[in-house]
């Protein structure tokens, strides 16, 4: 899930207001379109809505001087649902993944951070799930909903670290075993994803160009992990992501 922002994260993020100002004249139309797409699901397919969100992310990247480089697309399963499990660096992570993934995605997000203007519209348009991190019963309900949708063919983003702070950068925190329950229940592929330098987009006072990286690693299929416990799956995925970060010189 997209985790809660740590109190340490107090850096003035100039790129965010700068990007908003450069797109201010577009915002009314964007918000109107997102609301219409959300309110008329019978009119717009999941892919059509997702393509529009990708268009918005493209605007954010062009006007915010951000570029996302993608590697390992050949590792993505060609058919059926799956769950992307990336390391978590900052507020731009989900946008980097949308920029790097052509097929429709949804996501699980911390409920407390999901109702900001524009963020809320994106979450609703993508059919995202809002998880209450302080309510285990509600969290289990969300996991079961995600598992059902993934089994039916949807693809989800779920951040197994559950959070980040300003100092985290390209380092890893412990992956939470419970994050993997949705994929296990759906018997779906688990796709480890490595994000590099995504934190730089909103954790800097400068507006210099930023290039983020998204690396899709080979997936773990159900046949490979069915005998493992969720803590073992978490350790395996974390180790693979950590190894790739080390190979890239950021571990």
Please report, for each region that a protein language model flagged, where it lies by residue:
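Amphipathic coiled-coil/heptad-repeat helices and related helical stalk/stem segments
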Residues: 69, 90, 115, 139-143, ...
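Short, well-ordered coil/turn elements that cap or connect secondary structure elements
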Residues: 63-65, 102, 120-125, 185, ...
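Short gly/ser/thr-rich secondary-structure transition/capping motifs
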Residues: 63-71, 138-140, 196-198
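Catalytic core of membrane glycerolipid acyltransferases/transacylases, capturing the structured
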Residues: 40, 48-49, 78-136
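Non-catalytic C-terminal accessory region of glycerolipid acyltransferases
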Residues: 2-9, 140-251
């Amino acid at each position: 899930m997209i985790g809660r922002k740590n109190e340490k994260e107090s850096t003035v993020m100039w790129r965010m207001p700068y990007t908003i100002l450069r797109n201010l004249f577009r915002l009314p139309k964007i918000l109107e379109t997102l609301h219409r797409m959300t309110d008329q699901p019978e009119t717009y397919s999941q892919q059509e809505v997702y393509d529009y969100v990708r268009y918005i992310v493209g605007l954010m990247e062009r006007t915010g001087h951000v570029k996302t480089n993608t590697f390992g697309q050949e590792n993505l399963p060609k058919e059926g649902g799956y769950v992307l499990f990336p390391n978590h660096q900052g507020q731009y992570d989900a946008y980097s993944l949308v920029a790097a993934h052509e097929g429709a995605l949804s996501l699980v997000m911390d409920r407390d951070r999901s109702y900001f203007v524009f963020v809320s519209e994106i979450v609703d348009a993508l059919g995202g799930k809002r998880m209450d991190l302080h309510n285990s019963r509600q969290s289990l309900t969300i996991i079961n909903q995600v598992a059902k949708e993934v089994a039916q063919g949807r693809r989800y983003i779920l951040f197994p670290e559950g959070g980040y702070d300003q100092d985290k950068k390209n380092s890893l925190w412990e992956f939470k075993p419970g994050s993997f329950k949705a994929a296990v229940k759906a018997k779906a592929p688990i796709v480890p994803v490595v994000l590099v330098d995504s934190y730089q987009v909103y954790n800097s006072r400068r507006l210099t160009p930023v290039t983020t990286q998204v690396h899709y690693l080979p997936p773990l299929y159900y046949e490979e992990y069915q005998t493992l416990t969720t803590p073992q799956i978490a350790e395996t995925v974390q180790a693979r992501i950590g190894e790739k970060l080390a190979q890239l010189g950021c571990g």
